[in-house]
Amino acid sequence: LGETYTNINLNKPQNKPLNKQVYEGIENCNLCKRHQNSKPVIGLFNPNSKLTFITLTPMLDSQLNFLNNLKAAMLESIIQKVFNCPLKDCSILSLLKCDSNSLNLEEEINACLFHLIWQLDNSASKVIVVFGEILPKRLLNLSKEESFGRIVSLKTKHFLSTHALEDMLKNPTLKKEALAHFKIALQFLNQS
């Protein structure tokens, strides 16, 4: 008589490991409009690597192969020839997880930043090499002048900032500066 029955048997949330939740969060991300034109790329994340490289946009495809462009080829060369590091022994990440022409860079950075911070928080890397001016500003709250070419420590992480790959391609004299920056990172790695 006027009563209704409601089935309150709720589905319990799946207790997935945190890293699986984050990976699925990145893979299924739709926090900004970039995902409409590109599939999110987690990057090569090795939590035990001693060295991490971070670019603004992905340099790897979803199969973890380097993209077929000059920036990705330059990064691969830096990792293998300058740092003499096998790809399996490093992490290659990006701030933005989708590669497309920017629609609203600030909004996209805000949407993706927590994914990258989680990856860094769960990384054992001794040195994190960041490319370009946007990353040190967003991760460390430091300008180019304050961060480029020096080891900057934040919590237990050590960052080295250098020129963006695209800037080095446009202005080859920046490659010499970047090489000097990389030598600082190598010295730091060898000391620790």
Task: List PLM regions with ranges.
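A polyanion-binding, active-site-adjacent surface
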Residues: 1-192
